[in-house]
């Protein structure tokens, strides 16, 4: 969040499983990839992305290796009981202190063990301020009615959350996704960075609290679960700031951005002809997102007018522009574009996708920009990432010129094979 010096234009706070990530109807993650391109193209430079998930950090990191998730500015895990910031996931110790008030995990564990209706979930889901169980839906009311006064009598304040049809979480009273969001908004306001608009996105019961925070827009994706829809019907059906999207998962989030007029909602992935693609704002980050989408389509054999495209690309490269391969080898940018010709369609019919992450542009001197990003490439189940730095120059009224591109293997990538990495 420190990279922003003014209030974010938009802060998206989204659940992951079956909200940002579609595990059942989108095996190629196309809706997620569309959102990714939109975010990096139009929002990353002046907005905040927050993931708020029921997963513990261990399981969140596992999901990142399985799905093309962007890197969030803030990650809220374990149903709003843990908050961390940035790439390094620096924990918020102040939030821990807040949750410690009137909380004793040992007492909660002791009292819940007396209920045979509660079956502990796996060890990864048990956290310092959260105990997670499975329970039959029909038993929830009876268990909470009896468990609540027992814990209260022992001086422990808790919150019960039922979601997913059978998941039952016992949290520290101050926890939960809604309280974590309220805390984050208060923190940003104190820093003079209260978002101009905030959009909360969810699909299940543990997302309910997100939609109760004042001055926050909300979207329930089309595949929202029964317990969330019941809450909406009883509590928020007349609230114009909360909608039930007609699109699933990430598609519903993109739909909500347009519905509430929070900013652009046309993903670069939905633009068929990049030669006609004009960004709303002049931003060299747009050029990078557009190029790597072109690269994906080129290798999938999905580009028409190939000569026109390559000529346009070469014209946007400085005559003496250089590309530094992750192996350390250097060659002309224009020669690199020429070499793309022999790779046209080599990934046709294969599961091949490319996406960009953390695209951030800095104007170093008038007319000169440095863009840094992570460029991911996936073929089948194999994925690789290079941290990429691009130098652009521009003149008023003219487009951006590619001056220099350098790539090094990212620490996140497990496969570092120079031989089949092109750019």
UniProtKB/Swiss-Prot annotation:
EC number: 3.1.3.24
Source organism, top-level taxon: Eukaryota
GO biological process terms held by the UniProt record: sucrose biosynthetic process
SUPFAM superfamilies noted in UniProt: HAD-like, NTF2-like
Reaction catalyzed: sucrose 6(F)-phosphate + H2O = sucrose + phosphate
Cofactor: Mg(2+)
Cellular-component GO terms for this entry: plant-type vacuole
Pathway as given in its UniProt record: Glycan biosynthesis; sucrose biosynthesis; sucrose from D-fructose 6-phosphate and UDP-alpha-D-glucose: step 2/2
Family annotation (InterPro entries): HAD-like_sf (IPR036412), HAD-SF_hydro_IIB (IPR006379), HAD_sf (IPR023214), NTF2-like_dom_sf (IPR032710), SPP-like_dom (IPR006380), SPP_C (IPR013679), Sucrose_Phosphatase (IPR051518), Sucrose_phosphatase_pln/cyn (IPR012847)
Gene Ontology MF term list: magnesium ion binding; sucrose-phosphate phosphatase activity
Keywords: Hydrolase, Magnesium
Subunit structure: Homodimer.
UniProt record similarity statement: Belongs to the sucrose phosphatase family.
Role according to the record: Catalyzes the final step of sucrose synthesis.
Protein name: Probable sucrose-phosphatase 1
Organism field: Arabidopsis thaliana
């Amino acid at each position: 969040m420190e990279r922003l010096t003014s209030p974010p234009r938009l802060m998206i706070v989204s659940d992951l499983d079956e909200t940002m990530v579609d595990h059942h109807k989108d095996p190629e993650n196309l809706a997620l990839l569309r959102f990714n391109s939109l975010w990096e193209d139009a929002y990353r430079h002046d907005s905040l992305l927050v993931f708020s998930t029921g997963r513990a950090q261990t399981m969140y990191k596992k999901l990142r290796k399985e799905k093309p998730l962007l890197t969030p500015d803030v990650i809220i895990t374990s149903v709003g009981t843990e908050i961390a910031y940035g790439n390094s996931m620096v924990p918020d110790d102040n939030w821990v202190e807040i949750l410690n008030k009137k909380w004793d995990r040992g007492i909660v564990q002791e009292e819940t063990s007396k209920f045979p209706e509660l079956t502990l979930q796996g060890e990864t889901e048990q956290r310092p301020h959260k105990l997670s169980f499975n329970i039959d839906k029909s038993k929830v009311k009876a268990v909470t009615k009896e468990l609540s006064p027992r814990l209260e009598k022992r001086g422990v304040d808790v919150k019960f959350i039922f979601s997913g049809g059978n998941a039952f979480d016992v949290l520290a009273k101050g926890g939960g996704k809604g309280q974590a969001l309220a805390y984050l908004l208060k923190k940003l306001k104190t820093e003079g960075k209260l978002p101009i608009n905030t959009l909360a996105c969810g699909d299940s019961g543990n997302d309910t609290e997100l939609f109760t925070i004042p001055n926050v827009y909300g979207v329930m994706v089309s595949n929202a679960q029964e317990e969330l829809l019941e809450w909406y019907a009883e509590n928020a059906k007349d609230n114009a700031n909360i909608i039930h999207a007609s699109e699933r998962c990430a598609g519903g989030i993109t739909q909500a951005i347009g519905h509430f007029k929070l900013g652009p909602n046309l993903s670069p992935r939905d633009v068929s002809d990049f030669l006609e693609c004009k960004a709303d704002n002049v931003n060299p980050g747009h050029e990078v997102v557009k190029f790597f989408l072109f690269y994906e389509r080129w290798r999938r054999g999905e580009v028409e007018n190939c000569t026109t495209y390559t000529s346009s690309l070469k014209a946007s490269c400085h005559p003496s522009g250089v590309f530094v391969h992750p192996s350390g080898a250097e060659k002309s940018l224009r020669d690199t574009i020429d070499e793309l010709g022999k790779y046209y369609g080599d990934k046709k019919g294969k599961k091949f996708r490319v996406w960009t992450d953390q695209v951030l542009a800095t104007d170093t001197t008038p007319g000169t920009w440095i863009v840094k990003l992570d460029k991911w490439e996936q073929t089948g189940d194999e994925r690789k990432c290079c941290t990429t730095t691009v130098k652009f120059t521009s003149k008023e009224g003219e487009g951006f010129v590619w001056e220099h591109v350098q790539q090094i293997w990212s620490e996140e990538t497990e496969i570092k094979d120079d031989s089949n990495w092109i750019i």
